[in-house]
UniProtKB/Swiss-Prot annotation:
The lineage of its organism: Eukaryota, Metazoa, Chordata, Craniata, Vertebrata. This is Quinone oxidoreductase-like protein 2. Pfam families: ADH_N, ADH_zinc_N. The modification N6-acetyllysine is found at residue 35. InterPro entries: ADH-like_C (IPR013149), ADH-like_N (IPR013154), GroES-like_sf (IPR011032), NAD(P)-bd_dom_sf (IPR036291), PKS_ER (IPR020843), Zn-ADH-like_protein (IPR051397). Its EC number is 1.-.-.-. It comes from Bos taurus. GO terms for molecular function: oxidoreductase activity. Belongs to the zinc-containing alcohol dehydrogenase family. Quinone oxidoreductase subfamily. The keyword Aminoacyl-tRNA synthetase does not apply. CDD domains: QOR1.
Length: 349
């Protein structure tokens, strides 16, 4: 994917064209054609509906789902042209007549689905959460997807207990580092971080992991066994899939739990049911965004918890890189080439 994206990456694609209309225009990144670089265009604002809020966006998080959507490979398809961007932070500019949850000037995080990679975003008021006083807009933008997922995986799905050992793969990514942060500082669990390079393992250790494994050097199961013995780990949070998932599954202790969060390695493994039976282990999935429709109170609580933990200074999101809006294609390439660690943000100001 990185090579295909890179072939088309050219500053020539970063253009601005003024849309006809009145009022103050704003800039937005548009996916006008699948598998092509985004373009930056000037957009004429539309009126807010009674249930909607207009937000002055300061930062927008970049997620792999944004890139997949622009490649036409995401499970949710969008009509072209569209603006990617699943999460943002900013300040309320205007509210619809039926909105009472936020007011002009409030600092908020937003989960609009898409449309966040723009200087302004109009979204339903239910997609916004107020940012506590001690949390910066920059920090807040790094929280929703990564920490919402981490909290849900560890607390709601795996039911992680204090003192348990958690193995997390892709540990230097935004969600991986969030898992380390929450497991260590909120749940008082011990973390083994697994990543694909010594540099990424070092970052994971600096972020609170008790030990690390570079799985590009050999068997993950054998390396974990040397750290914990034959007993195994209690919880696995896996973002990689493929052979790494299978080795992590075989590293579980009796009644261990493995949570599948993603397939960054590109391969979806089949689960050997006999392994579940022999140790009475549980394998489960987590599509965090689905809870918005299926169980909104629980979904919302994961975001409120992330904001509160950050307000209290108990967690600290790691922001690896910040790009300007005009550099959005460079930011996408940075992620697809696996150069990124922690959260990658776009600055809209």
């Amino acid at each position: 994917m990185a090579a295909a994206w890179g072939r088309f990456l050219s500053r020539a694609w970063l253009c601005r064209t003024a849309w006809q209309g009145c009022g103050r225009n704003y800039r937005a990144a548009l996916c006008a054609e699948l598998k092509r670089p985004l373009v930056i265009e000037e957009v004429t604002p539309r009126p807010v509906q009674p249930h909607e809020v207009r937000v002055n966006v300061h930062f927008c998080g970049i997620n792999f789902a944004d890139i997949l959507a622009c490649q036409g490979q995401y499970q949710e398809r969008h009509q072209l042209p569209f603006t990617p961007g699943m999460e943002f932070s900013g300040m309320v500019l205007e509210t619809g007549t039926d909105v009472s949850t936020v007011k002009e000037g409030d600092r908020v995080i937003g989960l609009p689905g898409f449309s966040g990679m723009a200087e302004e975003c109009i979204t339903d008021h239910k997609n916004l959460w107020q940012i506590p006083e001690k949390v910066s807009l920059r920090e807040a933008a790094a929280l929703p997807v990564s920490y919402g997922t981490a909290i849900f995986a560890l607390e709601h799905r795996a039911c992680t207990q204090p003192g348990e050992t958690v193995l997390v793969t892709a540990a230097a990514g935004a969600t991986g580092l969030a898992v380390i942060d929450v497991a260590t500082n909120i749940l008082q669990a011990k973390v083994i971080a697994a990543a694909g390079s010594d540099e990424k393992c070092q970052l994971a250790m600096q972020s609170g992991a008790q030990s690390s494994v570079n799985y590009s050097r050999g068997s993950l199961k054998e390396a974990v066994g040397k750290l914990v013995g034959s007993g195994g780990v209690n919880v696995v949070i896996d973002m990689v899939g493929g052979d790494i998932f299978l080795e992590a599954l075989r590293s579980l202790a009796y009644e261990g739990r493995i949570v599948v969060v993603g397939f960054a390695g590109g391969t979806i493994a089949s689960v050997p049911a006999n392994l579940l039976l022999l140790k009475n282990v549980s394998a489960m999935g987590l599509y965090w965004g689905r809870y918005r429709q299926q169980n909104f109170p629980v979904f919302s609580r994961s975001l409120s918890s992330a904001l509160q933990y950050c307000q209290e200074g108990r967690i600290q999101p790691h922001i690896g890189e910040v790009f300007e809006l005009e550099e959005v294609n460079d930011a996408f390439l940075h992620v697809t080439q696996r150069k990124s660690t922690g959260k990658v943000l776009l600055s809209l100001k």
